[in-house]
């Protein structure tokens, strides 16, 4: 990965998503984050600390404020040791209690963490049964994620510092769902499942058809 990253045109904005291996013991999870950060940070404009992948057993337990605080403290200390200092964002689950989000955001507001990404895929059991995918591993993405992701986006916008960056993701397939994220408080928007089904032309269509887009108002996340 390092070799490929070293060949990328750095005029583009590059984000790197890091997390622990599936078989990493709980006591060593911080070491996985630190290893990935040390190896890759110099190539990134922002590094995402993924504490919410549904495919890594028990990863979402890192929303516990004690565990969360230990991880971000270790990463922030590591960032200060290097000349290259990418922004650090936390990718959150859409399935936590409101109290958990409040604890996490209050902690972020008091640290040099740069922002959050809302949200990862959902493991909502009722939704999985409705979609007849309850027997399958992993989380639900795409249009079915839109409502739950937007609900958390609205909640977090109400409590996060204005200095922090909010990146919204989940259910963006057209101009309306794209603009909806900004109306709820996002600074930037990411797309995943929409690109799989619609292809890269989705981005072009959104930009061409969205009369509200102003380049002067965009938030930069480049280092």
What are these regions (language model features)?
Residues 19-23, 52-54, 91-95, 119-123, ...:
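Active-site beta-loop-alpha junctions enriched in small/polar residues
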